[in-house]
Structure formats: structure tokens, C-alpha cells
């Protein structure tokens, strides 16, 4: 048993090192790809050595903020998805499928129409919309007994309804073209203000998730077992819900509703390292950042020299996976 645990620990360490190398290479690749070709080595060098060149200005003012937004948004959505799947014990749970992203998007778009644009007001409205979307889904799914498939279907119905309301606002708004592009999930055009906006929420949210990862693992044991272990289940669920709202709301506010990151990444992580959330959450953050960084690179390559929203790439990757899980969901109890 000791040797088995030691092997698992060594396997996780090796996997973390490999993932970290892939992540660092992805950062360099993300900084180097664009209209101006810059080598990966030079891209990483310009982060530490200032020479005032045009290439360095491109990286420092355009590509580095965009890359950091990809890291923060990818990590935040992946951790939010892992927390939702743990709290609901539903493998189909994610911020997009449960109406959280759609609610946040609706409130943000409505605020942009009514109020002057402000990054922090957008975050506040995103939090409120995420909470409203999640609450509506929970109320619908819990009536008459909640099941994983019922929860997923309720989430998709609310997601479609809220998304249609958002589309209606965009159509009726004269300046809706820019908002429509944001709705596809886009991080191109990100700036340092966006980084400053999301960074504290992402760091605090992921930090809290890691601190309470042990309690998250207990949720998977069922309410009776968790109560027997002295856990306050209602308190844990409220705390996890707040963390999910922080991570999802901040991500939507700066990047739009990017889908499938929160669904795809936790499944991959659990397949690789097991069900213990002390490991699932930090690996989800790392894998989520990797997914969105590389998806952003693909978004620049698909229609080069034009750029596609990164949300389109994650949808192409995630849709077949969601259909696979939904098909398996017929057998979920």
C-alpha cells in the first residue's frame, strides 16, 4: 500500500512537470504567433530584457495581456467547472451548461446598453447574472426531485432562454456588433486593464478553492457521510457557490461566455490523477490555462491573417465531448 501511494505521488509529480513544460511552451507560442513573426525564444526573452524594440512593444502591450487573460480565464473556468461537478455530483455540470455564463452575459450586455462602459461595473453585473442564472436552473431542476440528466436539461433550457434574451438586446442595440463578437468568447483585444480586473478575482477564487479542497472532496461521499465527518454541508455549498460565481462572473466580464472549458478539463484531470480534489483543483487550473492558451493559438491560425474568437475553438473541441457525456448520462442515477 505504501509503495502504491508512493507510485501515485511520483506519477502526479511527473505529470505536473510535463504539464508545466507544455504550459511554458504554450506561453512562448502564444506570444510569438501573430501578424508580426517573433520567435518563441525572443518572445520569452523580451519578458525579462528591455530593449525598446518594436517587437517588444508588440509583446508587452498586445500579446502579453492577451496571453495572461487566457491563463486567468482558462484556469478560472476549469476550477469553476470542477467545483460544480463536485457540488452537484453531476459529470455534465459546467458554468455554460448550467446557465451561469448565460446569466452573466445577459446582465453584462444589459449593463453595457444602459450604463457607461466600466470594467468593474461589468464584473458586478456578471456576478449578479451568474447568480440569477444558477438559481433559476436549481429551482427548476429541484422541483419533483433532482437527477443529473434533469439538471443538465434544465441548465440547457435556461441557457438557451437567457442567450436568446441577450441576442434580442444586441439586435435592438445600434452598437451591437462589438458586443456580438464578445458574445462568441473573445480574448483578442485584451489589455492590461482587463488583466487588472480579472487577476484578483481569479487568484482569490482559485486560492479559496484550494484551501477548501478537502471539504470539496467530502461532498462526493454524500450528505450523510459528510455530516458524520463533522462537515457543515450547507455552509460548504454556499461557499463553493460563491467561489463559482466569482470565477465564472469575472471570466465572462472580461472575455465573454467561453464554453466547454469547465466541462472538458475536470474530466481529463480526474481520468489522469483520480478523484481527490486536493489534486483535481490545482491540476484543473493548470490544464484549463493550457487549453485556453493553445486554443487561442489555434484561433489565430484557423483563418490567418484574420483571427477567430477563442470561444469558437473551445466549442469545436468541447461539443463532441459534451455529446459523448450526454449519451453516457442516460445511465447516470
Curated annotation (Swiss-Prot):
List the disulfide bonds in this chain.
none
One GO molecular-function annotation for this sequence? transmembrane transporter activity
Q: How does it assemble?
A: The complex is composed of one ATP-binding protein (YfmF), two transmembrane proteins (YfmD and YfmE) and a solute-binding protein (YfmC).
Q: Which InterPro entries match?
A: ABC_BtuC-like, ABC_transptr_permease_BtuC
* Family listed: Belongs to the binding-protein-dependent transport system permease family. FecCD subfamily.
GO biological process: one example: siderophore-dependent iron import into cell
Record's function text = Part of the ABC transporter complex YfmCDEF involved in citrate-dependent Fe(3+) import. Involved in the translocation of the substrate across the membrane.
Q: Which domain of life is it from?
A: Bacteria
The protein, known as: Fe(3+)-citrate import system permease protein YfmD
Please classify the protein's predominant subcellular localization into one broad category: membrane
Listed under GO cellular component are: plasma membrane
Keywords associated with the record: Cell membrane, Ion transport, Iron, Iron transport, Membrane, Transmembrane, Transmembrane helix, Transport
A family per Pfam: FecCD
What is its membrane topology? Multi-pass membrane protein
Q: Where is the protein localized?
A: Cell membrane
> What residues form the membrane-spanning segments?
13-33, 67-87, 97-117, 121-141, 151-171, 201-221, 238-258, 279-299, 302-322
Q: Which gene encodes it?
A: yfmD
